[in-house]
Amino acid sequence: MCIRDRITRRDEGRLAEFDALFIRETTRLDHHTWRMARRAEHEGLVVIDDPQSILRCTNKVYLHALLRARGIPAPEGHLLNRSDLDRLDTLADTLTFPQVLKIPDGAFSRGVVKINSRAQLTEEARRLFEDSALLLLQEWMPTEYDWRIGILDGQVLFASRYYMARGHWQIYDHSGGRVRSGGFETMDPARAPEKVIKTALRATRLIGNGLYGVDLKQSGDRVVVIEVNDNPNLDVGVEDVVLGPALYRRIMAWFLEQMERKRQPRQVSTRQSPTS
């Protein structure tokens, strides 16, 4: 018998009552989602998003460095700290504008600024450094849409195109009184470019075996990973257009498999060590 219970952060003390925790809220390190994921893992629950995935995915600076170190294609970029303010003019001499400046833990296009000049680079860096010790400066890759590849335990669940908001360079436009977003297209993953799928799978292998949404840009034959999201959207009528209810059944089946695996007694070797 499967009992599902919708809980909130007020139920953190009850986590030991459950076998699994499925977090459906944007995660952050300084947040109850991080605390509850760690506590759930400590209590032996199956967890999505697990603490390791949250730690690796929510920090764009760390993720960029990880991707580059492991040979996963990512936009060209520079990691900046506050002491770099004095050398921004020198750095600007080596750049082609526009560039994109990001805080480590931005989400839904927040904390991401398009930089069009060296003067704006200095101005925006000073502003963002007021709240963040590190920033990521990356090349700007204009595209009509971003790919979002949904992956669970190394298997592709969905392939979507998220289009830029009308008249804006990002998927989400926060410039007005309300947030606007672009359209979408979800397709059978078999129809998505093989290079996009393979690159997304390579990226998630660096993170874990949980549920991820990999954002990629494609420009001609070039495919780069923008980020790996540990808490991807699963919206009715968007990401589930192809699989329908089977999308959610596959996720629940993964939880069940992991829970049953945890319940299996560990086999203790009965082999005796050879005597001398």
Residues covered by each model-derived region:
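Rossmann-like NAD(P)H-binding beta-loop-alpha module
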Residues: 75-98
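A long amphipathic alpha-helix within ATP-dependent nucleotide-binding catalytic cores
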Residues: 171-222, 246-265
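ATP-grasp fold ATP-binding core
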Residues: 67-68, 92-111, 132-147
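Phosphate-binding site of ATP-dependent enzymes
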Residues: 113-204
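Glycine-rich phosphate/pyrophosphate-binding beta-alpha loops
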Residues: 27, 109, 229-243
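Protein kinase-like catalytic core scaffold
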Residues: 99, 157-158, 212, 224-227
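A short beta-strand motif that forms the metal-chelation/ATP-contact edge
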Residues: 18-23, 149-152, 216, 222-236
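Conserved N-proximal alpha/beta basic substrate-recognition cap immediately N-terminal to
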Residues: 4-76
